Amino acid sequence: MWIPSKLTRPGRLHNAIVRPRVLELLQQAPYYKLVLFRSPAGYGKTTMAAQWLADKTNVGWYSIDDSDNDGFRFINYLLQALNKATNGNCNNAQKLAEKRQFSSLRSLFSDVFAEMVDFHQECYVVLDDYHVINNEEVHEAMRFFLKHMPDNLTLVVTSRANPPLGTANLRVRDLMIEIGNEMLAFDTEETTRFFNQRVADGIDEDTANNLRNYVEGWPSALQLIALQAQHQKRTLAQSAESVSQFNHAHLWDYLVEEVFDLLDADTRKFLMQVSVLDHFNDELVYALTQREDALGMIESLNRYGLFIYPLEGEQNWFRFHNLFGEFLSHERQARIPQQEQELNRNAAIAWLKQKSPHQAIRHAQKAYDGELVAEILNEFGWKMFNQGELSTLESAINLLEKDLLFSNPKLTMLRAWLAQSQHRYNQVGTLLAEAENEHKKRNIDLDIQYQGQANALLAQVAINSNDPEKALELAELALSQLDSTVYRSRIVATSVVGEVNHVIGRLDRALPMMQQTEKLARQYQVYHQALWAILQQSEILIAQGYVQAAFELQDSAFRLIEEQQLQHVPLHEFLLRVRAQVLWCWNRLDEAEECAYKGLQILENHAPSKHLHSYSMLARIAIGRGELDRAGKFIEHIQHLMKQSTYHVDWTANASLSLILYWQAKGKLNAIQEWLNTAVRPENACNHFCQLQWRNIARAHINLGQYDQARQALDFLQSEAEKANLVTDRNRNLIIEAIFAVHQKDENQAKVLLKEALQLTNQTGMVGNFLIDGATIGTLLEKLTNRHELGDLERHRALQLMKDISSNQRSRSVHFDEEFVEKLVTHPNVPELVRTSPLTQREWQVLGLIYSGFSNEQIAQELDVAGTTIKTHIRNLYQKLNIANRKEAVTTAENLLQLMGY
């Protein structure tokens, strides 16, 4: 007796979401022999096939179960499905099958194809859940069927495993469409539609994306999350926030029933053991399980659709689906808890054989094996340090028992270096002193090599603390103590000697020392030290006036970061910071802004105090664009950070420049005076950061009309810059001197200084420093070019500067800043409506941005406010200016700009 439901298409598709991206791929199905839906349980293979074929007329459906491994039973159901798909064109063959009147399945299929010769319509036969078939006779018959079936027939197979139907041959000949779990997994858009269809409150894109990523788009898991959210009356956002605490009981029950209990005991044990690894290859699995057939087992499980995925681009590396991995861990801890420590210990040893200490440490910690952790740190700690794996190292060292830590001087030295490398300089001396004391308690002698390493480290701390004399003394002492084999500390000591020479203005000595440091660091693969040396060279070259050479050297630093995967090391932010400063000086503000924001991303997990440089640059960029409101927000950040932390003069000088430029633009002379009252005045100015600080002081005095003090500061600046051959700083100082001359009403001297500055700019390319004072020097530049007082290169540079100054002024006007609005409303010819219905400053800004072509969304982003707030501002300004629409707003803004001479 045949069961009709086995030949019935699935119903209840009303709740399934439409999958256009999958359906689009299936449009070409009539031209293929086989359409294979292959994925693990719960990916919606059957639902997708049914949805796709719902509007097709000639479809036969066969739902397979375990009992269909009987050849007679299988062939009869298959022929009934085929007969249905062909409108009864296989009746004779079906009768032969029912009466067992055929010698072989091949001969029967030959009769079937002969009967179908007059049927030319497109048709489909579906074999649903083919993975339960393990009868080789059936497989062989289906291979014959696929090879010889007519072109108008397409076979559709759903299976958890790769069916033995000659799929490799079909794939090579492009006769098969394969829909795998990558296609069947929901993307974020489909996840959003799925939940919106099931949950009354709907779902936002971020929540949908979080949930989708957690379950890797697995539809069954998403369905269970939706049901649980409804049952517990929780929003999906709450479910997403606590997704790791999600009640997995129903999901685990599903996997036990649909997957795990169907496996033999040996395979279940294998999966539970391997699940201790996040990702794995056959060598790891062999070391863990001692199974000679490790690779065969992995490939077999992959073929059978057991949630094992090959890693893209990796040879014989695999991972479990996230949730299946969690499920296996749960089963492992429930069924074989006594093996947990041993498995993790074996996993640690296996990872060591793969030269992966990071993973080995993780498993050694899970095995609660402190001695193994210490062994790994001893052997691989410095290598991991050189590769930038600082947080992993620090957490491992912090978890060691005191006896394990202080029994090994190598580990205590590593601990101190970790503090230094993460800018905790004030802890280094304490850590070294504690280590020395603890080692003595344990009768451990600290040899001269240890002392040399400690001195090299303390030298680095001294230079970071702005004590170059002490740094040089310690670095030279370290070099006299250290053997050439202790290469890391020798590299650091050499670097410190170079940095000291940089700080004290001996650039001709500093550069070769840093080049030597880079060479040694690359030779011994101490890559973050090589990166540091490149950055120092870049700053030295900038100071010497070779800015283009510095820029190109920075490119090599970016390559090093990419090659050695140092993207998350704090020095990456330092590189972006120096690059942003060069780009700002070259007036490439968009690129400088991008660097500053990237720097903030890199430091997002570090203390907010480290963000000062990025905010200083962002404020300067906003000031340069005339976006004073935006700049004001960055200035607030800067002031807050400077109150909260103590900084090196390099940091405070950069931040102070942004503060002074902002106060200068806003006319806040009291703020400038307050800053000047407490400003640090370095004893010398033989390096770029002390030069910058003294330039800030000179600028402050000029703004306040304190010309005698300004003159003294400028004389000191240029004297120091000349002594240390700081070419780029001389260039910047000349511009400030020209500003001073303008304030002194000495136009001739101002022009002489500007001419000299332009000549130096041919080498340095520095234009940003001209532009920040464009309103003061613009007229002088015009006079210089008109009177042919400049050489060709200087004239070209001056014309470009005038163009940029004009563009910046127009930009500020379009942004309708306070100064522009004040001039506008007092203009004798301004329309009465503008005078009697004054707009707020924010409404003027919005009008300017509308004129610039910004959409509402872009305006909201530019001013960093909500879209609804922008709509309110637009409604208000339309009402006040009697404007009906955006077009009229643009016309009004244009008329006002023309009135002001723009």
From Swiss-Prot:
Residues 856-875 bind DNA. Activated by ATP and maltotriose, which are both required for DNA binding. Gene3D superfamilies: P-loop containing nucleotide triphosphate hydrolases, Tetratricopeptide repeat domain, Winged helix-like DNA-binding domain superfamily/Winged helix DNA-binding domain. Pfam families: GerE, TPR_MalT. ATP binds at residues 39-46. GO terms for molecular function: ATP binding; DNA binding; DNA-binding transcription factor activity. CDD domains: LuxR_C_like. GO terms for biological process: positive regulation of carbohydrate metabolic process; positive regulation of DNA-templated transcription. Residues 832-897 form the HTH luxR-type domain. Keywords: Activator, ATP-binding, Carbohydrate metabolism, DNA-binding, Nucleotide-binding, Transcription, Transcription regulation. Belongs to the MalT family. Monomer in solution. Oligomerizes to an active state in the presence of the positive effectors ATP and maltotriose. Positively regulates the transcription of the maltose regulon whose gene products are responsible for uptake and catabolism of malto-oligosaccharides. Specifically binds to the promoter region of its target genes, recognizing a short DNA motif called the MalT box. HAMAP family: HTH_type_MalT. PANTHER family: DNA-BINDING TRANSCRIPTIONAL ACTIVATOR DEVR_DOSR. This is HTH-type transcriptional regulator MalT.
